[in-house]
């Protein structure tokens, strides 16, 4: 599986499991809903800053977040 798809699926699963909209996630990590949508659709790969803020939002370390993505590769 391509990395952009693995990131997309992981982010979508975490977000939906927590019951958070793309808009709420974007607001929490100082981003935009459109950017979150593009990531979840595999069109963009998030910056390290966005990955870090997203991991924090979901109470995950960068290592744990990366491991979830790696499981899909």
Predicted feature descriptions by range:
Residues 10, 21, 47-50, 61:
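Residues that mark the N-terminal boundary/hinge immediately upstream of a DNA-recognition element
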Residues 16, 27, 56:
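Alpha-helical residues within the helix-turn-helix
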């Amino acid at each position: 599986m391509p990395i952009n798809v693995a990131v997309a699926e992981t982010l979508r699963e975490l977000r939906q499991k927590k019951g958070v909209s793309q808009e709420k996630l974007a607001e929490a990590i100082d981003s935009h809903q459109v950017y979150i949508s593009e990531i979840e659709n595999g069109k963009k790969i998030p910056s390290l800053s966005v990955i870090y803020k997203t991991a924090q939002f979901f109470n995950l370390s960068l290592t744990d977040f990366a491991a979830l993505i790696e499981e899909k590769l």
